Amino acid sequence: MLIERSAKAQLLYYLQHFPAVVLLGSRQVGKTTLAKSIFGLTGKPMVFLDMELPSDFEKLQHPEIFLRPLKDHCVVIDEVQRAPALFEALRPLIDEHRVPGRFVLLGSASPSVIRGASETLSGRVAYLELSPLSLPEVQGYFSWRDHWFKGGYPEVLLTPDLPLAQDRLQQFIRTFAERELGALGQEVTPPLLLRLWQMLAHHHGQMLNVQELSASIGMNTRTVNRYLDLLEGGFMTRRLLPWYANLGKRLVKTPKIYLRDSGMLHTLLRLTTPDALIGHPACGASWEGYVVEQIIRTAGPRWDYHFYRTAQFVHCSARSGSASRSRA
């Protein structure tokens, strides 16, 4: 089953106006499938390279030699964070033949990808984030109940056997903690990262208290903050900042923390069935996070998202505001 992604139209739009597009999102979210779905729609021959394949990685050890003859192609480079030096090589190639739609760069870790692209490809690149499947995207295929409980990762959602679906998420979590960050040059202690991740699941939808997390896990606050940045940069968590325009001291300025995928949240909480979720104390927080995430995924990046909370603790999650207007 191939579910049409709402980001497809935006990707094609960017390729008509920018020399390069960086498509960001966590692993298994559907970036490769989306990129391959535009083959034949760009008006150019397309070449696909995967930096996890030794043969493709070798081709780009001297990128100018391989890529210069492809100036009239659209070149898709998957897992580009594996080759951060590539950004520097792309800049002169783009400037030599500056036309829209030359490169699509797929990345699974935003800090390294954005840092490399922003420093070297400024003015040449557009960014597009791909989240797990949103509720509007799966309507007609899955109920909102299934989507809420299993989350939006395509392979998980398309797995009819619930224990197998959760096993896929467990493997995803372990792989991210034990292999992915290390492969990107990040020094982490996987058991501690997993403990923090599970602790965040129990604090889902709450105000982020780094000192409390540090004391509970036995990690110093500096390490906790670094791990929080890695989880957020890997698209696993989201910090929702407070809205405080014109409200001064009445507002609490600490962010709220959410796990971005509801299925991953339920797996970390060891909730194995929808009935177990409904009877669990975390049900309300899970639903809040699910609604917040659907609002953000559906409304898109042109809004800023905040929660509103006064000293009397009356609050409205996911207040979105642009430069000239706001909605609650």
Explain the meaning of each model-derived region:
Residues 34, 38:
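Hydrophobic positions on the alpha1 helix immediately C-terminal to the Walker A/P-loop
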